């Protein structure tokens, strides 16, 4: 439809040029009599009609160019189209200072030492003042320590909500050479999915799938003789 409109527009412009030439001829011959005057009137009428058609086609072409809220250059018409953007998570580099326990590590982040609490997971305690050392706590601590100490690259990934807890610890997903430590702990049955608070739950479903698999395989905290403590 747009191509046809442009074609007709070009034809209209050509007609206008021809009409102008005819008017010029009529003016040069207007002194030759009544016939010349009629010819002049005819040429003028053709020009006016052509200009009306060209104007109409031009408006139609402009309307076609902005159809669906996007003009032909690809820019959006804000009065017609509005897109809702979703904040994406991104990983940031950090370096290891030390692993504290199964779900807590201390990293150098943006030039400052910072303690991080792994999001959405909870491992058995090893240093709790009241609970003491819980079953599978040492195993979880050793697992996390091995992952982060052997990694050549450590990254942190904050979620969409609150970045720190009431103790000032960073709340994040921790990656060791591209592997999420949070998920690895859950998959090995060394952590449960816990402390889920929106909107800091982007990876919740992924973690729950890993937890379900660990339960199915009765790994560590989900083993038969320890299943109740993990519920």
From Swiss-Prot:
A cellular-component GO term for this protein: membrane
Source domain of life: Bacteria
Cofactor: Ca(2+)
Tagged with keyword Cell cycle: no
Binding sites annotated in the UniProt record for Ca(2+): 103, 122-123
EC number: 3.1.31.1
Role description: Enzyme that catalyzes the hydrolysis of both DNA and RNA at the 5' position of the phosphodiester bond.
Family the entry assigns: Belongs to the thermonuclease family.
Protein name: Thermonuclease
Source species: Staphylococcus aureus
């Amino acid at each position: 439809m747009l191509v046809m409109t442009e074609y007709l527009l070009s034809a209209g412009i050509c007609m206008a040029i021809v009409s102008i030439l005819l008017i010029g001829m009529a003016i040069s011959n207007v002194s030759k009599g009544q016939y010349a005057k009629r010819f002049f009137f005819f040429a003028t009428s053709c020009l006016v009609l052509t200009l009306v058609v060209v104007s109409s086609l031009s408006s139609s072409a402009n309307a076609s160019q902005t159809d669906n809220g996007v003009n032909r250059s690809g820019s959006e018409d804000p009065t017609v189209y509005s897109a809702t953007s979703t904040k994406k998570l991104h990983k940031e580099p950090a370096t290891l200072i030390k692993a504290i326990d199964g779900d807590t590590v201390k990293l150098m982040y943006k030039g400052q030492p910072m303690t991080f609490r792994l999001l959405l997971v909870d491992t058995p305690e090893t240093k709790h003042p009241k609970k003491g050392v819980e079953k599978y706590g040492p195993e979880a601590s050793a697992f996390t320590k091995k992952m982060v100490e052997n990694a050549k690259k450590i990254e942190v990934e904050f979620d969409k909500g609150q970045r720190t807890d009431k103790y000032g610890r960073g709340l994040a997903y921790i990656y060791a050479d591209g592997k999420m430590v949070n998920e690895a702990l859950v998959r090995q049955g060394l952590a449960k999915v816990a402390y889920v608070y929106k909107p800091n739950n982007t990876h919740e479903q992924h973690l729950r799938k890993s937890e379900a698999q660990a339960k199915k395989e009765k790994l560590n905290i989900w083993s038969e003789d320890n299943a109740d403590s993990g519920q």
